[in-house]
């Protein structure tokens, strides 16, 4: 067996080395935009101010006017590729130009517009039916006539801002309207106006501010006292969740004409001129604006001298459409831009570090496989685990790779409002050591759910155990999948290879080494994690000219150390919400989760078990502060060096892996990537072993093969392997079918169900009159309450566990009073 394991790990590592070495030989050193060849798309009159968008992969333009406003169009053209077009004559009900175009899933929504005399309120949808363009006018009219307005689609709502109300007399608008597409019969609603005042020809784009998608309004033109138009350089952001505008400053360049979102938090701004005059072959410039650090940098000159009219997404690229109608030639030009992601191989040194890490894990599994004689050794380590190792294992199991990336990402994007959630373990540790551990140790049980049969009945035990097993399989799948996405995006490491390496190695050493291998590998992985994290904090801070002092100054100036508001609002992530959620979540996790409870049972005595809990609790405090400070340091670093940010990574959680891969020295990169592997695998191994334990003890030995102790160890290893393979397969399916959103729903539903488990255990431990009938009613009512709370969003999602806990406890106790069963 040991020789097979060695060969297996060696083969995996050689695949990794060969794949990355070949890939490293053909990579670019910088992220860049590859520009295509400029092409003439169309020749004709009326090319200014057209409605437009992408429909079924083709660019559709309709309406428009000439440079001298003497000709106004009703036609539409459908561009196929860079050459060729289909012309649809007189498709519009009237000549129109300078309206707002928004691409919807089923067509292009055209809003407002004008002709030579007036502005209009009409709204219509351009669709494609049987290969032909069709116009649908069954849409609510605007409250006021508008042209030259800015508009976007956000969360199935259409927003329209500013614009021109009338031509004679000339009048600009500061209006802000929204149309809910799910209830468009309600019509347009008015929202709080932008504090920047009236404007037209502003650019508007949707991008995530680090917390949620927001509406960004930048630039435009406004009327001066001399009755002329002047370019604006200010910007504002509207948060739909808060229904509030915030200023972005007034340092944006003049002449911005288009914008698109890129990556997780970037906005690409296209500038067609640098002043209030139009000059032929004026340089067009691409700017990058980052929504989290609120930094703006000049990226490059666009090899395109004509007036930029629109920038559209098409086939995963952006397509610039412009014209030279102001100079009398009446040609429509196109230019495609492709974002080429930053690519770099890991290199031999980093790969050797990662291989060394996997070799150590394999060695630990082989070593402890020789010490197992029965399932007591396999599941409880024969009581040989020292308290400090059990404490490190508790910490490692709780800290997954998702947490390893998500905590720095959260602090980088927002502040320290969630720091109290992790530190909340200190509040519940006294309850764990004084209530839960004495029950589990005195009963000499192997799984937490054995207690439920002793206290209530076998049905409750089996249901809770099966729910735990299913949850752990799903959890392992996502713990494999999500870090693999980040590593793939940042390093280019193949997702399937990444999932396979982590999954296969975890299955191997967990299957052959049992809980002892899990605990000791967890201990090593925690050392790698914290060592790498401490190095990252020091290295990031030293990268700034002012060192640690500058990091702190930038963080303080931008509110990055804020702990959240003290308002008692349970619908928002206030300080009180976080503290309450932390108490109930940690009480449920550390008191009822088999992967945690199993660690208490591996020590030699109750005193040792209690010390392991306090070790984990005390270790959580500095570790949490370190990981939050990593995020804060990343914010300060990218505030000073915004040019090192990437516009291609779509996931904000990848910011720490991005820094690791692009900025850290050779060798350290391998160590920190091993840290990501370590964070994932410590959770995987713990979940795998605890799920196998629950199956063997609560189902296999209890019902299927009762009294068959001779084959339990073999069955335990088979169960570990099967559960691991199912989880690995689930991760592969998520990668193949791109069903990350399915995990969100899966996790949400099972999380709502498991939220009642903490209340169930406390019901049994703290009351004598609670019985099995009342407990079952408590579980059912708790699930109903949870689903009701989730549907109507009565509380912040952090409080779902608390609502499940409380409802199960009180309903279960009250229901028990109506049933006569033997008191405990």
Regions found by a protein language model. Give the residues of each.
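Intrinsic disorder/low-complexity signal
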Residues: 1, 30, 85, 105, ...
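Bacterial N-terminal signal peptides that target proteins for export
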Residues: 1-9
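Polar/charged alpha-helical tracts
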Residues: 3, 23, 241, 550-557
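Bacterial N-terminal signal peptides
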Residues: 8-17
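Kelch-like beta-propeller repeat domains
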Residues: 13, 24-346
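Membrane-embedded helix-loop-helix hairpins and adjacent transmembrane boundary segments
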Residues: 341-824
């Amino acid at each position: 067996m040991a020789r097979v394991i060695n060969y297996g790990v060696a083969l995996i590592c050689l695949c990794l080395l060969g794949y990355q070495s070949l890939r490293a030989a053909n990579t670019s050193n910088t992220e860049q935009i590859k520009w295509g060849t400029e092409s003439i798309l169309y020749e004709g009159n009326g090319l200014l101010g057209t409605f437009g968008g992408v429909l079924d992969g083709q660019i559709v333009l309709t309406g428009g006017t000439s440079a001298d406003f003497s000709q106004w169009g009703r036609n539409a053209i459908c561009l196929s590729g860079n050459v060729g077009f289909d012309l649809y004559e007189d498709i519009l009900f009237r000549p129109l130009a300078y309206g707002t175009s928004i691409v919807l899933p089923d067509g292009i929504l055209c809003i407002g517009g004008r002709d030579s005399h007036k502005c209009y309120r009409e709204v219509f949808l351009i669709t494609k039916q049987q290969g032909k363009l069709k116009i649908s006018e069954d849409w609510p009219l605007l409250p006021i006539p508008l042209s030259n307005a800015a508009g976007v689609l956000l969360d199935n709502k259409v927003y329209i801002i500013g614009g021109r109300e009338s031509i004679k007399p000339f009048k600009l608008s500061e209006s802000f309207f929204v149309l809910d597409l799910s209830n468009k019969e309600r019509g347009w609603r008015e929202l709080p106006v932008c504090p920047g005042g009236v404007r037209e020809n502003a650019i508007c784009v949707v991008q995530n501010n680090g917390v949620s998608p927001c509406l960004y309004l930048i630039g435009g033109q406004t009327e001066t006292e001399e009755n002329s138009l002047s370019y604006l350089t200010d910007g504002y952001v509207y948060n739909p969740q808060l229904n509030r505008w915030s200023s972005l400053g007034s340092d944006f360049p003049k002449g911005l004409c288009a914008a698109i979102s890129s990556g997780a938090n970037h906005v690409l701004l296209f500038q067609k001129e640098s002043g209030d005059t139009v000059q032929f072959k004026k340089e067009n410039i691409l700017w990058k604006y980052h929504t989290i650090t609120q930094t703006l940098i000049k990226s490059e000159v666009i090899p395109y001298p004509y007036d930029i009219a629109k920038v559209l997404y098409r086939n995963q690229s952006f397509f610039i459409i412009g014209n030279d109608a102001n100079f009398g030639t009446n040609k429509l030009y196109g230019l495609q831009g492709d974002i080429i992601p930053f690519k770099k191989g890991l290199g031999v040194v980093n790969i050797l570090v990662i291989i060394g890490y996997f070799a150590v894990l394999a060695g630990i599994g082989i070593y402890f496989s020789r010490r197992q004689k029965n399932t007591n050794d396999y599941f409880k380590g024969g009581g040989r685990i020292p308290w400090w190792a059990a404490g490190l294992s508790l910490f490692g199991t709780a800290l997954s790779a998702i947490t390893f990336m998500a905590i720095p990402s959260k602090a980088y994007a927002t502040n320290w409002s969630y720091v109290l959630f992790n530190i909340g373990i200190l509040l519940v540790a006294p309850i764990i050591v004084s209530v839960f551990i004495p029950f589990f140790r005195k009963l000499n049980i192997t799984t937490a759910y054995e207690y439920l049969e002793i206290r209530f009945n076998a049905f409750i035990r089996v249901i809770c155990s099966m729910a735990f097993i299913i949850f752990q399989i799903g959890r392992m799948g996502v713990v494999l999948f999500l870090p693999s996405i980040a590593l793939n995006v940042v390093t280019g490491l193949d997702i399937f290879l990444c999932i396979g390496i982590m999954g296969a190695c975890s299955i191997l050493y967990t299957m052959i080494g049992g809980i002892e291998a899990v605990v000791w590998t967890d201990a090593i992985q925690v050392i790698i994690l914290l060592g790498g994290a401490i190095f990252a904090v020091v290295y990031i801070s030293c990268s700034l000219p002012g060192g640690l002092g500058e990091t702190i100054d930038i963080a303080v100036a931008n509110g990055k150390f804020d702990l959240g508001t003290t308002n008692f609002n349970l619908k928002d992530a206030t300080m009180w919400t976080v503290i309450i959620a932390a108490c109930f979540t940690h009480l449920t996790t550390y008191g009822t989760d088999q992967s945690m409870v199993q660690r208490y049972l591996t020590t030699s005595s109750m005193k040792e078990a209690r010390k392991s809990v306090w070790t984990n609790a005390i270790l959580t405090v500095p570790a949490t502060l370190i990981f939050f400070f990593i995020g804060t340091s990343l914010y300060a670093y990218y505030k000073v060096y915004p040019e090192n940010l990437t516009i291609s990574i779509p996931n904000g959680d990848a910011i720490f892996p991005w820094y690791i891969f692009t900025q850290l020295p050779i060798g350290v990169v391998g160590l920190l990537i091993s840290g990501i592997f370590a964070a994932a695998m410590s959770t995987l191994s713990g979940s795998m072993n605890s799920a196998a334990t629950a199956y063997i003890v609560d189902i296999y030995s209890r019902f299927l093969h009762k009294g068959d102790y001779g084959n339990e160890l073999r069955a335990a290893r088979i169960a570990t392997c099967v559960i691991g393979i199912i989880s690995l397969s689930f991760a592969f399916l998520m990668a193949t079918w791109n069903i990350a959103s399915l995990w969100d729903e899966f996790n949400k539903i099972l999380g709502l169900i498991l939220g009642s488990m903490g209340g169930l255990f406390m019901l049994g431990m703290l009351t004598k009159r609670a019985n099995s009938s009342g407990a079952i009613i408590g579980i059912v009512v708790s699930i109903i309450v949870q689903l009701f709370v989730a549907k109507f969003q009565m509380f912040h999602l952090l409080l779902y566990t608390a609502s499940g806990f409380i409802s199960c406890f009180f309903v279960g106790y009250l229901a028990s009073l109506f049933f006569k069963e033997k008191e405990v």
